């Protein structure tokens, strides 16, 4: 999450991009123009490498720690135990963000931040996190298990895809849909006829 100061700096950049002098003047800009500008607005890069970096719509408009609505960074809140104890279902695809950006530059090595967050969640107690790792190669163009490819399965929308899914894909989708529905209803994804899904614990990662 951004700091309030960085969010304010980015807001000032956006006003300049809109060619307006104040928030009041910005409010007179037609909504369609605002939406278009929000997408084309160059991404902010405080590292000094230049403003025009990829994924601008994703990186420009993220929450900030403003001291009122959000009072601390999410990771810090987890570690300090400042959260409502609730069950969690979280996961990733094996090909998550493995394709380079539009300029072909490979992504730097990550620091396993999501695993650290899960560890912090488990250590805080009072909840049971269930974790999944989606590893199904998408048929059609050998794209692998790319970002969001699990959504077709969990929401049961395989028929809406152009990809040549087969019978076992639909079986997996049905099982995932049941897991997700059970979790939403009870906080536990397990149910009759489903392979047991064990919650993560402080002693190690389980999928």
PLM region descriptions:
Residues 1-119:
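Substrate-access "cap/lid" subdomains that shape
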Residues 47, 119, 123-207:
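Mobile gating loops/cap/lid regions near enzyme active sites that modulate substrate access
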